[in-house]
Every structure is written in C-alpha cells, then in structure tokens.
C-alpha cells in the first residue's frame, strides 16, 4: 500500500494572497501533492486610465488614486492581491470595451491567461520539485486558461481526465457544474454532467483507492447549502435571516453513490465547508473566503484504501 499526503483547496477566484498561501502550504505541511479544484480566476477588471498629463486615474475599493507611471506596478500588485485584474488603458478605449461585450470578454480572457501563467511560474520558487501540483479549472474559469495550464511544465492539468496522485492513487477531475444563475463558462444540464463524469471515472483502475475531484458537491449533502435567491437574483430573507437550500449537483451524488470512490473533493459552494459520508465515500468541501485573503483547505493523508488524516486548514 502507498501512503501519500496532499493539500486540497478550491475557489480562490483570482486571490493572489490565497494562491501564494496554497503554494507555501506544500513546504509547511511537507505534503506530496497540492490539488486545486477551480475556480482559479478573478472576474473584475480595475481600469487604470492614462491622462493627457502623463498621470493615471484609477478607482479601487471605492477609493480614487492618481498614479505616476512608476507607481503602476505596485498598484497592480495591490489590485491582484484581492482577486481583481488591473488593466492600463485610455478613457476612450475603456468606453469602447464597456460598450462591446465581445471585446470585453476577450479582454477578460487575455488578462486571466496572463495571471494564470504568472501564478504557475511561481510554483518552482515555492514548491519542492517532487510535489505534484494538480489543477482542474472550475465552472467560473474560461476555457482559454486550460491551454495555459497544459503547456506549463510545473503543473498537472486534470480537467476531464484521470491523473496520478502517486503510483497507487488516481484523481478523476471534472470542473463542470449543473446550471447556475450566473451562466458561467462550464455549466451544463444534469444529464450531460452525469455523462461527462461517467466518461472520466470509467478510466479509473481501482475505485477503492480513487479520489474524485468534482467541483460541484453532491446535491442535498450539507456541503452544498447556499443562500436562496429570488427571481431578481437577490438573497431570500425571512425573519431577518438568509434562507439556505441545496445547490449541489444531482449528477455528482449519483456518481458518488454508483462508483463509491475513497474520497470526493468538492468546492463551488463557498458557504458550506465540512465533510459528509455517502456510503464508503468521504466527501469534503473546504469552503472559501478568498475575498478576505483566507486560504481554506484540507490536509489529507491516505494509505492504500484508507483515509488516515483529514484536517481542516485555514490561514
């Protein structure tokens, strides 16, 4: 039997602070692997507007800045730390981008690819070469970042594939989810999702030692409870409290029940950290507080077909 340890995290949504903590955790906990289940990228652009006098205007976290050109790199770092994407442009170009959805989406795509490449290039600086870094994008990640991950020599691309955790344990990865209110890049019907998952897990050699890294947690599992939304996508509030309900995927639950792997790694629902049991399968969700720069993760040790350690990690 092979014993291995890894840190699992998810839903860092462009937070460079969380990404650096994730990489640093490899040496802190002396693990054999890091596993990230999307959503990796940020979704908000902060324009840095060039003025005629050579200065630059920007608004960040409701605060206005006037920057010199030499101050832009440091300001950009500050913006990226909290999941936003800095972009230097002119007021005229910013107006054109705002009015053109196609141009806006292309810009998001390009900026996200730049950030992902930069992040992956930090791996050899932070992580021992013998520690595998397995990444499977999530529903909020644009498809364009996949090629960036595939081409990087420091990361293992897992999406819709089965990759080796070690010589005995395999990780089957699917980052797609069932439909959400946000029309994200990787979502589909429950029926299609089940077929996607089934196609991947059928490549697994040994279910007793397998790990399923499915971004969306099982439906109605206590690790999938999210605030309920009304038809205007506003939280439902009753008696002064938010109403919560299940928001996971029925396809995930069905696959877990049918195939019974050793472990299920999930995310997607930030508000529901914890772990549950489905038959012999332990399913966990670390949750996410990326906006506060808090890394939420699990330290996992497995030995053959047994889980020998399961510890919440936050920092």
Where do the PLM segments sit?
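Binuclear metal-dependent hydrolase catalytic cores centered on His/Asp/Glu-rich metal-binding motifs
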Residues: 167-210, 245-246
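Active-site-proximal beta-strand elements of phosphoester/diester hydrolases
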Residues: 3-13, 168-180, 211-215, 282-288, ...
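Core catalytic region of metal-dependent phosphoesterases/phosphodiesterases
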Residues: 18-166
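Binuclear metal-dependent phosphoesterase catalytic core
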Residues: 14, 162-168, 184, 188-189, ...
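Active-site neighborhood of phospho(di)ester-bond hydrolases with catalytic His/Asp-centered motifs
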Residues: 8-11, 34-39, 132-139, 157-159, ...
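Catalytic phosphate/metal-binding cores of nucleic-acid and nucleotide-processing enzymes, i.e., regions
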Residues: 16-23, 29, 46-47, 151, ...
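Active-site-proximal segments of metal-dependent phosphoesterases and phosphodiesterases across multiple
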Residues: 101-113, 211-260
């Amino acid at each position: 039997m092979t014993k291995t340890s890894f840190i699992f995290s998810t839903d860092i949504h462009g937070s460079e602070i969380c990404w650096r903590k994730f990489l640093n955790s490899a040496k802190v906990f002396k693990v054999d692997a890091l596993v990230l289940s999307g959503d990796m990228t940020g979704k908000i652009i902060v324009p840095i507007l060039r003025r005629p006098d050579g200065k630059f205007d920007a608004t960040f976290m409701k605060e206005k800045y006037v920057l010199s050109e030499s101050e832009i790199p440091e300001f950009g770092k500050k913006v990226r730390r909290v999941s936003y994407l800095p972009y230097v442009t002119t007021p005229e170009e910013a107006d054109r981008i705002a009015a053109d959805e196609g141009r806006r989406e292309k810009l998001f795509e390009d900026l996200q690819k730049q950030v992902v490449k930069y992040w992956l290039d930090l791996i050899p600086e932070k992580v021992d070469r013998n520690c595998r870094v397995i990444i499977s994008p999530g529903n909020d990640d644009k498809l364009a970042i996949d090629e960036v991950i595939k081409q990087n020599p420091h990361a293992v691309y897992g999406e819709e594939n089965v990759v080796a955790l070690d010589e005995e344990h395999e990780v089957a990865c699917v980052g797609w989810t069932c439909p959400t209110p946000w029309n994200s890049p990787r979502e589909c019907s429950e029926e299609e999702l089940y077929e996607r998952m089934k196609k991947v897990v059928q490549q697994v050699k040994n279910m007793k030692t397998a790990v399923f890294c499915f971004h969306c947690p099982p439906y109605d599992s206590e690790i999938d409870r999210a605030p309920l939304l009304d038809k205007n996508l506003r939280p439902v509030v009753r008696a002064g409290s938010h109403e919560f309900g299940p928001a996971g995927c029925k396809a995930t639950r069905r696959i877990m029940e049918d195939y019974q792997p050793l472990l299920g790694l999930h995310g997607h629902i930030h508000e529901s950290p914890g772990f549950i049991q489905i038959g012999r399968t332990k399913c966990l969700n670390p949750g996410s507080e990326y906006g506060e720069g808090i890394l939420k993760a699990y330290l996992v040790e497995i030995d053959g077909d047994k889980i020998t350690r399961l510890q919440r990690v936050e920092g």
